[in-house]
């Protein structure tokens, strides 16, 4: 199935274009019947990542950050990941014995091929650089992520609220946690619009 990259602007940024279709009582026909939708914050983000070749030559490492106390389903996510990823390639924060603190998680971002966040997220519409992911000792802010030098992982998966939300008053601004991870070097990012 072909992949269609959407780069919406203005108020179209807030529309779930991937769900467009004819939803009448007779039959359902929708965009997903014809192609897989993917979103990009800018056309420039579609260009090949210059460090893509370098990241493929290093050993695979997955970092998982969870909040199992506040989000019970995060434990299930972690268990499913642990079934598929060898323990020597997995770094887990947010569980007993491995506190998810801001500085440790931020410094490990550059070593990760894939990161999976299953925690709370928050967007600061007035100061977007203060948006971030809630960890054990505070917020991993966009401004802190941007300080890391060589983020070249293949995927950042953000199972957290408000990680791809925009500001309705500034619809052409691409400042969200998901977009920031992409701009900081991750080749692909999955983030939430809720």
Stretches with model-predicted labels:
Residues 1-194:
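Catalytic cores of enzymes
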């Amino acid at each position: 199935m072909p992949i269609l990259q959407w780069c919406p602007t203005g108020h179209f940024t807030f529309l779930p274009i991937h769900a467009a279709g004819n939803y009448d009582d007779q039959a359902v026909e929708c965009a997903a019947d014809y192609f897989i939708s993917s979103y990009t914050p800018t056309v420039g983000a579609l260009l090949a990542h210059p460090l893509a070749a370098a990241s493929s030559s290093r050993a695979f490492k997955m970092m998982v950050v969870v909040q199992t106390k506040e989000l019970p389903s995060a434990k299930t996510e972690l268990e499913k990941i642990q079934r598929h990823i060898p323990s020597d390639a997995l770094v887990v924060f947010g569980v007993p014995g491995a506190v998810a603190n801001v500085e440790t998680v931020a410094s490990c971002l550059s070593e990760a091929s894939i990161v999976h966040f299953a925690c709370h997220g928050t967007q600061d519409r007035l100061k977007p650089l203060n948006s971030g992911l809630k960890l054990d000792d505070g917020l991993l802010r966009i401004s802190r992520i941007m300080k890391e030098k060589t983020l070249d992982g293949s995927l950042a998966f953000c199972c957290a609220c408000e990680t791809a939300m925009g500001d309705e008053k500034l619809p052409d601004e691409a400042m969200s946690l998901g977009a920031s991870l992409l701009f900081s070097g991750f080749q692909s990012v999955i983030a939430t619009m809720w």
